[in-house]
Amino acid sequence: MFYSPLDQFEIKPLLMVNNILTLALTNYTLYLIIVVSIIFGYTSIISNGRLGSTRWGVAIIAIYDTILNLVYSQIGKAGGHFFPLIFTIFNLIFAANLISMIPYSFAISAQLVAIVSFSLALWIGNVILGLYLHGWGFFALFVPSGTPLPLVPILVLIEALSYSSRAISLGLRLGANILSGHLLMLILGSLIVNLMSSSILGFIGGIVPIVAVIAITILEVGIAIIQAYVFSILLSGYIKDSVSLH
């Protein structure tokens, strides 16, 4: 039987309930519940001040301060209003990416339809925020200052297309990185297993590639963390555009 490397991203029902409505608990839903539960426990520890001086406490405080500084450096004084949102989203992506690195787990960040829909919702929220704060003046964002009048229609079209592309690119960047990383690890791992199970010589020759796979896995863990941070940076920048129109 042939197994595709993409099978690991297939959404499968784990529990079906057929009544008036058909309800299904899928692997995507299960891991999403796990991630959200971790976020609730994580935030409750912070809000109740039970961090202490343990290594976990120091790590949580470091993450908190990092995102807080990021938000204020990107958005400015108004950043405090948006910090809870960005901090929650960072931790959601951070936890989801790390859980996906566990063998036989499920990568919810690699579901392109879901993650792009999420970024689209955030983009729509940014547009609504800009219209709420500035009214029709929000569309001045699409006209660069000092633009010659004859070039205004062309630049407005370019800026509008660039701004609209954020709705897809924000989530697509995250999903594509996680998807490609997991595919690479699975393909290399499968090749090494086949090589080492072929013969004694193949078993000996497969030891060196194992070291490479371990190195790639460590790199993927770093990328998983960086992608959560990059998502937060970009979202903060988009909110800044809606708040200050530049």
From Swiss-Prot:
Example GO molecular function: proton-transporting ATP synthase activity, rotational mechanism
Nucleus as UniProt keyword: no
UniProt record, GO biological process: proton motive force-driven ATP synthesis
Localisation per UniProt entry: Mitochondrion inner membrane
Location (main, coarse): mitochondrion
Regions that span the bilayer: 20-40, 56-76, 82-102, 112-132, 138-158, 176-196, 203-223
A Pfam match: ATP-synt_A
Keywords associated with the record: ATP synthesis, CF(0), Hydrogen ion transport, Ion transport, Membrane, Mitochondrion, Mitochondrion inner membrane, Transmembrane, Transmembrane helix, Transport
Key word ATP-binding present: no
Entry membrane topology: Multi-pass membrane protein
GO cellular component: mitochondrial inner membrane; proton-transporting ATP synthase complex
Propeptide: 1-3
Taxonomy, superkingdom: Eukaryota
Known function: Mitochondrial membrane ATP synthase (F(1)F(0) ATP synthase or Complex V) produces ATP from ADP in the presence of a proton gradient across the membrane which is generated by electron transport complexes of the respiratory chain. F-type ATPases consist of two structural domains, F(1) - containing the extramembraneous catalytic core and F(0) - containing the membrane proton channel, linked together by a central stalk and a peripheral stalk. During catalysis, ATP synthesis in the catalytic domain of F(1) is coupled via a rotary mechanism of the central stalk subunits to proton translocation.
Family (UniProt): Belongs to the ATPase A chain family.
NCBIfam families: ATP_synt_6_or_A
Quaternary structure note: F-type ATPases have 2 components, CF(1) - the catalytic core - and CF(0) - the membrane proton channel. CF(1) has five subunits: alpha(3), beta(3), gamma(1), delta(1), epsilon(1). CF(0) has three main subunits: a, b and c.
Name of the protein in its database record: ATP synthase subunit a
Species classification: Eukaryota, Fungi, Dikarya, Ascomycota, Saccharomycotina
